[in-house]
C-alpha cells in the first residue's frame, strides 16, 4: 500500500515590514562577545588560565559546557578578572580594580553545576502559554492578557550561568525566535478577534486586549540597530501602548548604549509618539556599575550622595533617561555567591533609584536543571530581601517573588513557629494543643499571586504553607500547603482540613487508611 503524505501547510502571506528610514549603525567590534563550548580554542585557553588543567578537565568530564555554553565580552571580563579595558583611542572604559568575585560567580562555569541536574527543562512551564497556532508555537509567550513576550534574539553578549532560558539556547523545548511581522500580526489578529467576540474568548471568559509587547530572548540589544528597529516598528504597527525591552546589556556592555542606538530610539518615537518605551534592565550586583578602590570599597561621591559610577554605565543610564518617552526598571534573581547579601541588595536598590532606575523585582532563582548550584533557599532569600529594604523609601523598594506556572508569586512573609508557653499549655485541651502546634509549630509562609495568568479572577490569591527552610522553589511547599487559591473554591482549605483530621486521629505516620480518610474529609 502506498502512503501519500499530506502537503505541508503553507504560511499565510504577510505584509512585509518596510523600514522607511535610515537606521544608524553601532560599532561594537571592540567589545564583541566570545561564546563557545570548552573545545572552542579561545574558551579553552581562558578556562585553563583561570582554573588550571585539573579542574578544567574535571568540568569537561562533568559536561558543564554541555549544560550551558560559556559566553563573555571584554567589558564584563575586565570586571570579573580585575583587568583594565580601553577603547582603541585609549579611553578608559573599565579602570584597573580588584577582580569582582560576585561577577566572576555570575559568569564563570562552576563544577557543581552538574553535580545535581534536578530541575525543569522548561521552568514555570512556559510552553503552556505559547500560542496554540502552529505558526506562532514556541515563538511567543502570552501568559498575561495585556502583554505578549516575543523571543527576538537567541543569544546574549555574555551568559549568566543561572539563565532560565537554557532551553532556548539549547533548543530543548521548542522555543524559537519570532519575526517582526509575525509578532505584529499575532497581536493585531488577537485583538481583532477579541473585539469581534465582545471582549471574550472562545470559552466565554472575559479577556483584555494586548496593550504591551516585551521583546526578550536572549537579549534583544545584541541585535544590530536595524534588526531591533524592525521589532520596534512591528510594535508600533500593532498599535500597542508600551514597548518593553528586557536586557542585561547595560550591565554586560553599557557601551552598547551609544549615540547610534539613542538615535534609533528617537526614530521610533518620531513615527509612534504615543508608544512609551520601557527598558527592563538586569543589574544584579553593584560591582557591575560602581567604581571600587584598591581595597575593593566603593568610592563615595565627594560633592553629593551615593557612590561613583563607572563612566560607560553612567553615560548609558543618563542618555536613556534624557529621552522623555523612555523609562528604566530593574529586575534580577538572587543568586548564591553573587548577590545573596543584605549589603549587595541594599546598595543595588539605593544606587539604581538614585540614578532614576526603578527597582521592580528580586526573583527567586528558577528551578532550571542544575539550579541547586545557584539557588538560595526561599526563606533565606526572603529574609535577605526584607532586611535589605530597611532604610529605603517605598519608591526604592522591589518585590521578592518567584515567576511560577501560576503567575508571579510574591513571598509576603515568613512567620516563626508557635509553641504554647509552659504556663498556658495545661489550660488548653490536649487535642486542641496538638492540632494548633501541628499547623503552626514549624511556622508558615505566605505567598500572594501578584500577577495571575489570563483573566484576573485569581489576582492576589494566597497560598499559605507550613515552613520548609530548605525549599528552593514553590514545589518544596506543595505537601505542606494549608490554603491554596489555585484549587477550586471548595477545595482551597483541603490541606488544612487534611492535617486537622490526621491530628485528630492521632496519626503522624504515613498510614494509608488515615491519609485516605483525611483526604476524603478535606474533599
Language-model regions: role of each:
Residues 144, 166-213, 230:
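Conserved alpha-helical substructure of the radical SAM core
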Residues 385-523:
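C-terminal accessory regions of radical SAM enzymes
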Residues 191-203, 208-210, 218-392:
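Conserved AdoMet/S-adenosylmethionine-binding subsite of the radical SAM
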Residues 142-179, 245:
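Canonical Radical SAM [4Fe-4S] cluster-binding loop centered on the CxxxCxxC motif
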Residues 136-139, 149-151, 185-186:
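Catalytic micro-motifs at enzyme active sites that drive phosphoryl/nucleotidyl and oxygen chemistry
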Residues 53-56, 81-101, 114-137, 189-209, ...:
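Intrinsically disordered, low-complexity coil segments
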Residues 76, 160, 360:
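Conserved, mostly hydrophobic/aromatic
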Residues 2-142:
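Flexible, acidic/Gly-rich N-terminal and inter-domain linker regions that tether
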Amino acid at each position: 500500500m502506498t502512503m501519500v503524505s499530506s502537503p505541508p501547510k503553507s504560511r499565510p502571506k504577510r505584509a512585509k515590514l518596510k523600514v522607511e528610514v535610515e537606521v544608524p549603525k553601532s560599532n561594537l567590534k571592540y567589545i564583541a562577545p566570545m561564546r563557545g563550548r570548552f573545545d572552542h580554542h579561545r574558551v579553552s585557553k581562558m578556562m585553563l588560565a583561570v582554573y588550571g588543567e585539573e579542574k578544567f578537565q574535571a568540568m569537561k568530564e562533568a559536561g558543564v559546557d554541555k549544560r550551558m555554553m560559556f559566553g563573555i565580552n571584554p567589558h564584563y571580563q575586565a570586571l570579573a578578572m580585575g583587568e583594565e579595558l580601553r577603547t582603541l583611542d585609549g579611553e578608559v572604559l573599565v579602570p584597573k580594580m580588584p577582580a569582582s568575585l560576585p561577577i566572576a560567580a555570575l559568569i564563570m562555569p562552576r563544577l557543581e553545576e552538574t553535580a545535581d541536574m534536578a530541575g525543569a527543562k522548561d521552568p514555570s512551564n512556559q510552553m503552556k502559554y505559547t500560542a496554540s497556532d502552529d505558526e506562532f508555537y514556541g515563538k511567543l509567550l502570552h501568559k498575561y492578557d495585556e502583554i505578549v513576550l516575543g523571543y527576538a534574539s537567541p543569544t546574549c553578549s555574555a551568559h549568566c550561568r543561572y539563565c532560565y532560558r537554557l532551553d532556548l539556547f539549547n533548543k530543548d523545548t521548542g522555543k524559537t525566535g519570532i519575526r517582526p511581522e509575525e509578532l505584529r500580526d499575532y497581536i493585531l489578529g488577537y485583538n481583532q478577534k477579541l473585539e469581534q467576540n465582545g471582549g471574550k474568548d472562545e470559552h466565554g471568559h472575559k479577556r483584555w486586549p494586548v496593550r504591551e509587547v516585551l521583546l526578550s530572548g536572549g537579549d534583544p540589544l545584541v541585535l544590530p540597530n536595524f534588526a531591533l528597529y524592525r521589532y520596534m516598528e512591528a510594535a508600533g504597527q500593532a498599535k500597542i501602548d508600551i514597548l518593553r525591552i528586557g536586557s542585561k546589556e547595560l550591565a554586560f556592555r553599557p557601551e552598547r548604549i551609544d549615540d547610534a542606538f539613542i538615535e534609533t530610539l528617537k526614530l521610533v518615537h518620531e513615527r509612534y509618539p504615543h508608544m512609551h518605551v520601557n527598558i527592563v534592565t538586569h543589574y544584579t550586583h553593584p560591582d557591575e556599575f560602581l567604581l571600587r578602590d584598591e581595597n575593593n570599597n566603593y568610592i563615595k561621591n565627594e560633592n553629593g550622595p551615593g557612590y561613583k559610577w563607572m563612566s560607560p554605565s553612567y553615560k548609558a543610564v543618563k542618555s536613556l533617561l534624557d529621552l522623555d518617552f523612555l523609562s528604566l526598571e530593574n529586575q534580577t534573581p538572587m543568586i548564591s555567591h553573587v548577590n545573596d547579601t543584605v549589603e549587595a541588595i541594599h546598595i543595588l536598590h539605593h544606587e539604581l533609584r538614585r540614578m532614576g532606575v526603578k527597582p521592580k523585582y528580586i526573583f527567586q532563582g528558577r528551578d532550571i536543571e542544575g539550579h541547586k548550584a545557584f539557588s538560595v533557599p526561599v526563606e533565606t532569600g526572603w529574609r535577605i530581601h526584607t532586611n535589605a529594604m530597611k532604610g529605603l523609601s517605598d519608591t526604592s523598594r522591589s518585590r521578592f517573588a518567584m515567576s511560577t506556572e501560576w503567575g508571579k508569586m510574591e513571598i509576603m512573609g515568613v512567620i516563626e513557629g508557635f509553641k504554647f508557653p509552659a504556663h498556658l499549655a495545661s489550660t488548653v485541651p490536649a487535642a486542641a494543643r496538638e492540632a494548633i502546634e501541628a499547623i503552626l509549630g514549624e511556622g508558615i509562609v505566605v505567598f500572594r499571586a501578584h500577577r495571575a495568568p489570563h483573566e484576573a479572577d485569581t489576582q492576589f490569591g494566597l497560598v499559605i504553607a507550613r515552613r520548609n527552610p530548605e525549599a528552593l522553589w514553590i514545589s518544596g511547599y506543595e505537601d505542606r500547603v494549608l490554603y491554596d487559591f489555585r484549587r477550586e473554591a471548595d477545595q482551597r482549605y483541603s490541606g488544612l482540613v487534611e492535617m486537622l483530621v490526621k491530628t485528630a486521629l492521632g496519626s503522624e505516620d504515613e498510614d494509608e487508611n488515615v491519609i485516605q480518610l483525611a483526604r476524603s474529609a478535606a474533599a
